[in-house]
Structures are given as structure tokens and as C-alpha cells.
Amino acid sequence: MLGWVQRVLPQPPGTPQKTVETAGPQPETESKPEANPQPEPEPQQEPEPEPEPEPEPEPEPEPEPEPEPEPEPEPVPEEAPPEVQALPPEEPMEGEGEAEAGPSLQETQVADPAQPTSQAQVAVAKVNRPSSWMLSWFWRGMQKVVPQPVCSNGGQNLAAGERDPDQGGAQIPEPCGTGDPGSAEASGTQDTEPSLWLLRWLEQNLEKVLPQPPPPSLAWKVEPEAAVLDPDPPGTPMQMEPTESPSQPNPGPLEPEEEPAAEPQPGFQSSSLPPPGDPVRLIEWLLHRLEMALPQPVLHGKAAEQEPGCPGMCDVQTISILPVEQVEHDLVLEEVDSCWEDAQQEDGASPQETEVAPAHEEESEAIVEIPRELTKIQEEREDEQEEDEEEKEEEKKKGEEEKEKEEEEKEKEKEKEEEKEEEEKEEEEEEEKEEEEEEKEEEEKEEEEKEEEEEEEEEEEEPIVLLDSCLVVQADVDECQLERTPSELASIQELPEEKEEKEEEKEEEKEEEEEKKEEEVEKKEEGEATNSTVPATKEHPELQVEDTDADSGPLIPEETLPPPERPPPSPVKSDTLTVPGAAAAGHRKKLPSQDDEAEELKALSPAESPVVAWSDPTTPQEADGQDRAASTASQNSAIINDRLQELVKMFKERTEKVKEKLIDPDVTSDEESPKPSPAKKAPEPDPAQKPAEAEVAEEEHYCDMLCCKFKRRPLKMYRFPQSIDPLTNLMYILWLFFVVLAWNWNCWLIPVRWAFPYQRADNIHFWLLMDYLCDFIYLLDITVFQMRLQFVKGGDIITDKKEMRNNYLKSRRFKMDLLCLLPLDFLYLKLGINPLLRLPRCLKYMAFFEFNNRLEAILSKAYVYRVIRTTAYLLYSLHLNSCLYYWASAFQGIGSTHWVYDGVGNSYIRCYYWAVKTLITIGGLPDPQTLFEIVFQLLNYFTGVFAFSVMIGQMRDVVGAATAGQTYYRSCMDSTVKYMNFYKIPRSVQNRVKTWYEYTWHSQGMLDESELMVQLPDKMRLDLAIDVNYSIVSKVALFQGCDRQMIFDMLKRLRSVVYLPNDYVCKKGEIGREMYIIQAGQVQVLGGPDGKAVLVTLKAGSVFGEISLLAVGGGNRRTANVVAHGFTNLFILDKKDLNEILVHYPESQKLLRKKARRMLRNNNKPKEEKSVLILPPRAGTPKLFNAALAAAGKMGPRGAKGGKLAHLRARLKELAALEAAARQQQLLEQAKSSQEAGGEEGSGATDQPAPQEPPEPKDPPKPPGPPEPSAQSSPPPASAKPEESTGEAAGPPEPSVRIRVSPGPDPGEQTLSVEVLEEKKEGAE
């Protein structure tokens, strides 16, 4: 009858339907209302309902948005074998059986039966009326055609409780499984009212056929099937609000896409029956169930695929918390309407508000999950969402490509700007190119690193989030009691990638913690500070918001910000929400003005906050980062301000100095005077290396003997050099000496051995030994020395071994050396030992000439060697002539004629004597008689005349060159004497001139050094001047502290002049144009009233005349007479030359002027000199004597001794007046002399005093006062004895000295005159 319904209703495609029934029936009992456990929030929505084609009496309201559906299973009769509907577990009643189920996928927890609930379970009563039988028949017929769900746990048998036929025939199946024993019991009681059965049947079938909304993401594959809402306990803000409906209908069960990996969970029991006998609550329950069945708004998440039907029947099912497939890396948080947000907050069951707790929680929880099957519509929507996500990924990729293009355009613009700068600055082109290449390489590396970091972050940040809704109920089960079920292990095996990613994340976090302990401590402190008010607990979970686009592409190619480190997971919950970072670039964009401080800011303000929200500029983490950047910028600005203040101070000081210089350019402070920079010491080697080196040196330089220990030079100093300098190497000249000796052996003895019979069989070995020794020397010279001689090529000295060898092999000397070493000695075997075969050894004459040149270059008196060499030439010519004469005599016959040698005496000496007489043409020789003798004699004469004429002329040249200087000196002296005689110069002056010539010639070896210096370049003149004069000039106190180069320039301008004894170097009053430095000898500075007193004597190294030369003090006249004491050699520096030098050294000029001012000021200061006393110093007068003297003065002439004391007082008065007059006269004489010699020049030497100008007396001496005070002020010496006189008058004596002060010729001068009255004095005595 109802078969057409089955054909019309939609069936799930390709879904196998299985029915598993329990073998033993179980009677249904009426369930009592029990308290339901507190549900956890569900992040899931129910599928949209679809209109049912079958007519129903109940009207369907319009779909209303419901944030959280609460499905509950309905009990169904046994007569529906194709499909079985699952009932939720109910609270156990007294006396009822308990159904057991395995532990859940993640954790099995025990539900608390004592928790309160706002929903009561409805018991199903028995129905015995006929209407109930009719309804049960209609119900069984509808279940045959309506698809039924299957229990998600296919491997578990289902238990169903059957009703007796006499009670209505309807059977209510028992739940598939329950939690722990005693936690839940399934009671299947039959409803007594048929209307309730009809309503339940309509509700159940509507939920089956209507489409359900998909879950937010594909990571959850199944949904909970039923839930009972309880009031939210305090402290759990994320749980749902309680609902008023007592029970809720159950939508069609959903089947997981891949496999039912769920296990039954305890703790959730509910009845889907409506409340009996309460029409108001019945209407509310119906409306609530319809709202749950109607379609709901869908979030942008991917739901798991579901199928409409599944065979089998199960009341309580569980789902796997671990995701089966990961499609997205992160959740996407998007903006929603305010009305929807309010509804979500009111219902408390929005999937966006709830997140899945991690696998390990500190608080014990019982998680019960009821799976739901997906419909075909959900699969289609799932595919659409996948396509949407792919489109979003493509858009992201396009955005990244656009960003890369923009970066490339920026790089191109930068390159253009750099090219413009290169055109302006051509000198810096190479450096800029290198910098550009380095920047490009760094950018490429940065991009590669960013891509790698992005991939790693994507892998690391793939959250293992469970997107299927579930109900979480707390229980009193510890974590140690939890175990994993086989279904959970199966689900874990299906996800190896997630496990590997977890392990990689853990390893990376461990490594980061080990490497950056300090940073982690700071981060923990910051995290504690931020979470101090609200700790991360279940009531206040820790939320981390990350930017999905922050690391998708490089924002700025110049910067590479380190990715934010992932914080360690919270002990309660660590959920991650990903926010699209559209505006992230704006926060990290580097401004053009920040180029200088970008790296500092990047290094000082990294992203260290554990919670990062790039899209929200008002987050406390970003505000903290901005504060850090601001603090860094403030530090940099403070440093810059300090530096600017320092620069301002320096500029002010410099301005003040310039003003002072403009006002008085000569006045400088001591601080401005340049100080010689201390010579930098060479860096000392490490102390650890010093002992080792010292030990090695000791081992090399010292040798221990039995008696003593002596030092020797290291052996490495005797190693043969790689190259030899033929011009300066003395060892090479010594080697040439040995080569010349070997050459002379051959040249002198080969003719002797050939002509004279000195080579015999008994001494042949001696001759051969010497011959081969000379050959060995020749061979060494060719192979060792000549191959290592340096030479000049293109102005460079070539020291390369190959180049030196090639140069010698190509030279003419090598050819001559080869000829001289021709091995003609092998002919001895055939021709006998003939000395003429060694004649080619004489071809090494080039070594002889080279030796002469090198030796003359190093000899101080080369003319001596030249004379010796010329004499040797003459002797060698005589040697050859004597050998030829003996050979001619032997050819004619010894003693055959008077002309030949007669064989008497030493043959060589007699022949040499004959050769000397013949070549010199002395005469007295016997006349030749034969034609051979006549020709031989003619050749001797011609050779003698030519040889001796050349020799004599060469000898004259040698001697003339040796005496050329003396000749020049004589010619100059003769010319000077002739000049003085012509002008009739006095003889005394002529003698002084002659003395000067002789002393100058003997002391210097020449009359004028400048003539020799003119031919030399400036560098050589400077070198010579430094060696000769620097040691003296550097000791001058005036030039100490001056520029070293200025002293070098001054050395080249110095002239050497010799002064004879008592010659005036300079006279007082002359114009000073020269400064003098004493090289040798002494000078005396004269002064005093007559100008002949020797004030000081200056020695070598002293300088004088500098005050006039520097023109300090307003004049440049000489202030004293300077006379040479003996022969004195002085260096003279002209004022013009000094000014030309000081122009280039302004600092030294200021220093010299300052020193000259100081010297002049010191010379003008008077020195306190002790006055010459006329009377010797007297001892102090005793107090008793002074008292007696005063008393006697008061008594007057009445006292017995009054006359004697009065006479003594008068005498002391006279002596004091004489002493004062003498002192005043001396002061006047010194004042007059100082005025005449005012401004006298002082020497720069420390021991050089200058004429002092004593100060004039401020107050002229006054005439003595009354006798009594003067007598008291100047008492007589203790040793003085009063003279006794019997005829002395009684009255006071008259004064014997008169002192008068009269005005002088000048208005400011006074004349002091002293008169002594001799007559009165004599009469008094």
C-alpha cells in the first residue's frame, strides 16, 4: 500500500543498508525523568531540511536561523528491518539492564548522573486501544518504505528491546552501546497515546528526507546525533544556553564519508517523545524541532560528506576527534552580520564560538560524540566549497605574482636611479655595480628563504582542528584511566602526515628552545604579564590569531622579517584562528626615510609576541611592537642629538679660534702648538710565542764548549743568495778578485812555461793542479755567479732566476767564457803537455775589467789603484818582452852571438833586464847581427815607444786627477793673493785670508760645497744634508716640535761658513738677515758698558740671531756683538729662505713666533742680583747693646758714658750713608748700560743669558733723618770698639757726609750726589 512512498522518496546513492538486531528482546519500561549532563558547545550546524513529498497534517513553518541544532533519536518499532533509527541513551532506571560500549576514540569518561537538567525524559506508555493498533500498523508500513539510519559502529551488534504483541506490537530498539557500566540504561516503553506516535513519526521522517546543513569544515566528518541542553554553569562562557523544550526530535542520522569510526559514548540520554498531557509544551517542542529541521545559514567551511541512509540501528554513537582529511591549513575568520552574532551569543551554540579541545587536557572530561551521516546535497556543497577554496588559492597566487611584479618594477626603478647616479659619479661605477650584484643575490636568497619559511610554516601551522560538532561533558575520570579504542587507532593510522607534522613541530620547538633560551624567558615573562589578569583556563582559553597572508610573499624585498615563533601549547586549550592579512603590508612597509635605521629597527624589534594579529592595528601585541620600535627610534634620536650637540660645540670653539686669529694672528695658545706625534711601536708578538722564539734564537746563536759558551751567527745568514747585485754586493767583488787571480795566473805563467824551461817532469803535477784549480774557479763563475746577476730592464731591476739566466746566456761575456774553457787539454794525450794549449784561458779579460770598475767604485782613493794598475800594465809588457827574448835566444842558440842570451845566471831576470833596456831605449846594448835579430829588435823599439808613451801619459792623467783638488785650491789662493796685492790690502788682512783658505781646505777638503751639490738632484742633496747636518739641527731647542719636513727643507738651504778667531759674526745694531747654527767651534756674546764683556759662550748645536730673523718685537736689528772664539764653522740660514719655507708650514711658523716672543719676554725680565757691599756684612747687634744705646741717647751728654755713645751713633750714621750712596751709584750705572744695550738679543740655548735691564728705583733715597733714629736703624757691628777721645766737645757732632738729590738732564731722572767732609772728619778724630 505504501510502496509508492518508497519509490517517490529519495534514496542514498550506492549506500549499503544493513540491519543488525539483537537476539534477545528486552521489555521496555517507562523511563523516569533524569538529569542530563551538561553539554559542551557544538561548533556545528544541522543540515538544511528538504520538503517532503508525502503529505503530513502538521504545517511546516518557514526556515528560521538556528545556530545550534540539538538532534535526538526516536525509538522505532522492530517492523522496520531495512533501516534502523538510533535512539539516544537514556538515564538508567531502577531495576533495568545496562548496555555496555567500548571506550571512546579519544578518551572515555564517566558521566555524572547527579547533574541537573532542564529537560525531562518522556516515558513511553503501553497502548491497548484499537487506534493505537491502527497507528502501529501504519507506522510499520511507513518504516518499510522510509530509509532508516545504520549504526555507525558496524562491527558492534545492536541490541533492540521488543514489545510483546499483545501490547501493541511496536518494538523500541535498545541503544547500540552505552558508556561505563551503570552509567546508562535503555528503556523502550511504548507510548499510550497514538497522536504522540504519529507526531513522532512525522518529525522523524521529515528530518530524514529534509537536507541538513553541512558542518563548517571538512576536517570533521561526522556530527553528534543527539544532545540535551542544560543550563550553563558559572565559569563556562562557551557553553550553550538552556532551552525550554523538554525533548527534541531527531533528524535523520548521517553516515560518515569514509568509514564509521565512532564508538558509543556514555553520558547522554534523551527521549525524542513529546511531553504528555501539556499542549503548550507540545507546541513549543514541535516548533523547536521544526526549527532544527529547517535549513540554517551556512558558514564558509567545508563539511564532511554525508550519505542519507545507513543500514543498522544504533542509539548511541561516537565520532573520531582526529580529522580524517585535512583540506585547509587554518580556520578563516570572516565578518558576519550583527544580528547573526547576537543570535549566536544568545544560543551559545555557534560553531564559530566553539573549538575542539586538544587531546591532552589537565581537567578530566567525558567526551561523547554522536556521528551523523552526510547527504548527497552536502557532498555537492562540499565540492562547491572545495572549488571556492581553490579559487581563493588561485587568487592568492595571483596576488603574490602581482606583488612580485611590483617588486620587480621597484627593482627596475631602483636600477634606473642607480644608473643615473653612476653617470653623475663615474668614479664610483665599479663599486656601485658590485653593490647592486650583492643586493640582487641577497634578494634572491631572501626570496628563497621566504619561500622555504612559508612552506615550513604552512606545514607547521596546519592545525589539527576537529570540525565536527560534539558534546563535551565533564566527568570524574582521570587521564591515566583513559585508553584508546581500535577505531581511534585506525583513524590515527589514516593520518600519518598529521603525526609527522606534529613530531616535526615538537622537534623544531625543542631546538628553538635550546638555541634561544634567553628569548624564551623574555617571552614567557611577557606572556605572564599579559595573562596575569585572565589565566588560560577552560573558562578563558588562549586564542592565537595568525595571519595567513603575512608570509605568503615578501612584502618588501629589502627586508626579511623573521616569522613569529609559535608559542608552546597552553595546558588547557590553544586554538588558532587565521585572519587574512590584507592590510599587513601597511604595518610592515618600510618608508623611504627609514633606510638608514631599517636594519637597526629590524634587529631591535622582531615579532616576539605570542599572539600576532596583523590585520588589527589596535591589538596590544602590535602596540607593544610599535612601542618597541618607537623606543628604538627614540634611542637613535637621542644619540643623534648628542652628536649634534657635540658638533655645535666644536663649531663654536672653531669660530672663536678663527676670531682670535683674525684679531691677533701671532698670538696662539700653547694648546694649538703642534706636538710631535709619538712614533708607533711595532705590534709585539704574543707572549706565548716569545719564549719559543727566544729559545730557538739561543739554540742557533750560542754554542757550548767545554771551557766556555760563545755566540755565533746563525747558519741561515750564510745561505747563498737567489740573486746578486753586482753594484753593491761586496761578496761578489771578493769573488771577482779570485777570478782575476786565476786569470792572472794564466796570463803571466803560460808565457813563462812556454818560453823558459821551468816546467819539468818532476813538477808537472804542481802546474797541472794549479791549472785545473783555475779552471774550476772559471766554471763556478759561469754556473753559479753569472747566472744570478741582477740587471736593469726597462728601468726595473730584474731578480727572476730564469730572466737572469737568459740575460747571461745572451750576453757577449758568456761567449767569451765558453771560449776560455775550451777543453784543449785532451790534446795532451796526443801532443803532450804543451802550455800553449791553455792559451784560451786568457780570454776571461772581461772579468778583469769588471773587477777594476767595481773596486774603483768602493775605494775612497781610487787614483791609487789606477796608478798601481798602470804600473802593472808596464810590468806585464816587459814580462812578455823578456819571454820573447829568451825564446829568440833559444831559437838562435844560447850564447851563439853577443846579442842573444849567453845562459849565465838566472835566465828570467837577465832577460827581463834586457827587455827593460830595450823598451825604454836606454842604449848600451849590443847590436844585432843577423836578420832575425834586426827584425826582432825593430819590433821591440816600436813597441817600447808606443807602450811607454801610452803608459807615461796615463800615469800623468792619474796623478793629475789625484791632485786636481789641491791644484784648484792653489789656483784660487794665488788668484786671491794677486787680487789683494793689486788693491794693496793690508798685510794683516791678507794673512787672515790665507789662513781662511788653508783651514777651509784642510777641514772640508774643498772651498765651496755648493759647487758639488749643484750637480746632484734634490733627493740626493737632501740625503746628504740629513746625514751631515740633521744631527746638529735637531738638537736646536728653537726647532723642537716643528714639522719634520720643514726641517728637511731647511737643511737644503743651509750654507756652511768658516770664521777665523776673533771674527765678528754679527755686530750690535746691524740689520738681521741671517740666523746662525754652530756646527763646530765656539762663539762669544759680548756686552756690558764698553761692549767687550763676555756675557756667554755658545758651543756646537747652539743657535743665535733667531729673534732678528723672525722679526718679533717690532725690529730686526742685532742686539749684541757675537765674536768667533777660534776657528768656527757655522751654518747660515737666510731670512728669505726661511720665509719661503714657513709659507708652506703655517703651524710651524706660529710655533716659532711664539717661542721667539717667550724668549724675548724672558730676556727682558730683570734678574735679582746681589748688590756689591762696600762694608763686609756685620753680625746682628745684641738687644742689650741696643737698649743701652737708646738709654744713652735719652740721657744725653750728662751721663758718664754719654759722650762715647753719641760719638758711636754718629759714626754708624756715616757708615750707613756711605753704603746707601755706593749702592745707588751701582744701580745707576747698570741702568745706563741697560738703556744703551736695550733690546739686546739673547741666545736660544739654555745657558745663554741676555743683558738684563734692572728696574729704576721707584723712590729716590732721602737724606738721613735725625741722628737718633738713624743710629737705631743701623747699629754698629758687635766687633766694633768705640774710639776714646779725651778732648771731645760736649755738644753733638756735625754730620761728615752730605747727600743731595738734584734733577737730571731728563725730566724723569734725578742725580744723587754724596759729599764727604774730610776736614771735619779729621778734626773729629
Swiss-Prot record:
Residues 105-121 have a biased composition (Polar residues). Residues 43-81, 380-393, 418-463, 495-517 have a biased composition (Acidic residues). Residues 1038-1142 are annotated as: cNMP-binding domain. The keyword Membrane applies. GO terms for molecular function: calcium channel activity; cAMP binding; cGMP binding; cyclic nucleotide-activated monoatomic ion channel activity; intracellularly cAMP-activated cation channel activity; intracellularly cGMP-activated cation channel activity; protein-containing complex binding; sodium channel activity. Rod outer segments. Olfactory sensory neurons. 3',5'-cyclic AMP binds at residue 1118. Residues 862-961 are annotated as: Ion conduction pathway. InterPro entries: CNG_cation_channel, cNMP-bd_CS, cNMP-bd_dom, cNMP-bd_dom_sf, RmlC-like_jellyroll. Residues 1-732, 786-800, 850-861, 961-1325 are cytoplasmic. The record marks 956 as: Occludes the pore below the central gate. This is Cyclic nucleotide-gated channel beta-1.
